[in-house]
Amino acid sequence: MAAIIVHGGAGTIRKEERIPKVIEGVREAVLAGWRELKRGSALDAVEEAVKALEDNPIFNAGTGSVLTLDGKVEMDAAIMRGKTLDAGAVAGIWGVKNPISVARKVMEKTDHVLLIGEGAVKFARLLGFEEYDPITEERLKQWEELRKKLIEKGETKHWKKLNELIKEYPEVLRSTVGAVAFDGEEVVAGTSTGGVFLKMFGRVGDTPIIGGGTYANEVAGASCTGLGEVAIKLALAKSAADFVRLGMDAQTASEAAISLATKYFGPDTMGIIMVDAKGNVGFAKNTKHMSYAFMKDGMDEPEAGV
């Protein structure tokens, strides 16, 4: 049974008027992926779904990615095939429109798994990815407002740990996007993000860490969202797939993974989406919101919500 699920990030959507736009964004993305999935390829479906999310400036990935402490964009992305365990990822990449597509090329064109920074950019240029500026006016304005808050309180001189910063300034935690699909033969997972607002230059979250924020094997795939350091420490995407290997379905495994995150790091930290090799979808969160949408064989329209 073919199935695909996408997410637009876990956290709190502070402006209620944004919720319909977010739901429409994940709905459009899952439909883009579903069209590819019906042609038979989970890999193409995941890439297309994530590209649709990257191209929508309401989400924190690709166009509309958040800015680092020094006002730049450093994006992360990863994709993984469950049947072969092939994987590709980029971290701290800039100047490209769709990091997920560069990550796929790392998987298909090299013997490596992860390329970072300038090396990832050079690789993208060699393969014909054009120069692109993903910074939007809205993100630049948000960055300036946050910087002003921090400067007024003197926070920039004595930089806080990320979890302390998020507690005091929750607006720095922005969404990640991801997709997981099953085409009847293989599960594929992909994730993309601009990271955390005002992150230290060079900071890498869970998204490009295979097993941390992105993972797929022969039984299941997962894409995580939230505070990346939590997912890395728990190897959360891999842990979720392991729960399926132990006999859980995708929904039960998703809930177990989030329970694990809450146990060790508290609420308001993580969200996850999954698909297992039986075509079951799963999603769970310990945050107020996590936008999602999914389609399966037998459904006429996607289910979407926050």
UniProtKB/Swiss-Prot annotation:
Practical use: L-asparaginases are widely used in fried and baked food industries to prevent formation of acrylamide, a neurotoxin formed by the reaction of asparagine with reducing sugars. TK2246 reduces the acrylamide formation more than 80% in French fries, chapati and yeast-leavened bread. High activity and effective acrylamide reduction potential, without compromising the sensory properties, make TK2246 a promising candidate for food processing.
Q: Which residues bind substrate?
A: R203, V204, G205, D206, T225, G226, L227, G228
Q: What InterPro entries has UniProt attached to this entry?
A: Ntn_hydrolases_N, Peptidase_T2
Q: Which GO terms describe its biological process?
A: proteolysis
Swiss-Prot/TrEMBL site (Cleavage) positions: S175, T176
Summarize what the entry records about the temperature dependence of activity: Displays activity at a broad temperature range and is highly thermostable. Optimum temperature is 85 degrees Celsius. Shows a half-life of nearly 18 hours at 85 degrees Celsius.
SUPFAM superfamilies named in the record: N-terminal nucleophile aminohydrolases (Ntn hydrolases) (SSF56235)
* EC category: hydrolase
What Pfam families would the database entry show? Asparaginase_2 (PF01112)
- What keywords are assigned to this protein? Autocatalytic cleavage, Hydrolase, Protease
User: Where are the catalytic residues?
Assistant: T176 (nucleophile)
Catalyzed reactions per annotation: L-asparagine + H2O = L-aspartate + NH4(+)
PTM note: Autocleaved. Generates the alpha and beta subunits. The N-terminal residue of the beta subunit is thought to be responsible for the nucleophile hydrolase activity. Predominantly produced in the uncleaved form when gene expression is induced at 37 degrees Celsius with 0.5 mM IPTG. When produced at 42 degrees Celsius without adding IPTG, approximately 90% of the protein is found in the cleaved form, while the remaining 10% is observed as uncleaved precursor. Undergoes complete auto-cleavage within 24 hours at 37 degrees Celsius.
Recall the GO molecular function terms of this protein's record: asparaginase activity; peptidase activity
What switches its activity on or off, per the activity regulation note?
A: Undergoes auto-cleavage in a temperature-dependent and glycine-independent manner. Metal ions and EDTA do not have any significant effect on enzyme activity, indicating that activity is metal-independent.
Taxonomically, the superkingdom here is: Archaea
Q: How does activity depend on pH?
A: Optimum pH is 7.0.
Q: Which family does it belong to?
A: Belongs to the Ntn-hydrolase family.
Instruction: Give the protein's biological function.
Output: Catalyzes the hydrolysis of L-asparagine into L-aspartate and ammonia. Also displays D-asparaginase activity, which is about 10% of the L-asparaginase activity. Does not exhibit glutaminase activity.
**Oligomeric and partner information:** Heterotetramer of two alpha and two beta chains arranged as a dimer of alpha/beta heterodimers. The uncleaved protein forms homodimers.
Q: What name goes with this protein? A: Plant-type L-asparaginase
The organism encoding this protein is Thermococcus kodakarensis (strain ATCC BAA-918 / JCM 12380 / KOD1)
Give the source lineage, highest ranks first: Archaea, Methanobacteriati, Methanobacteriota, Thermococci, Thermococcales
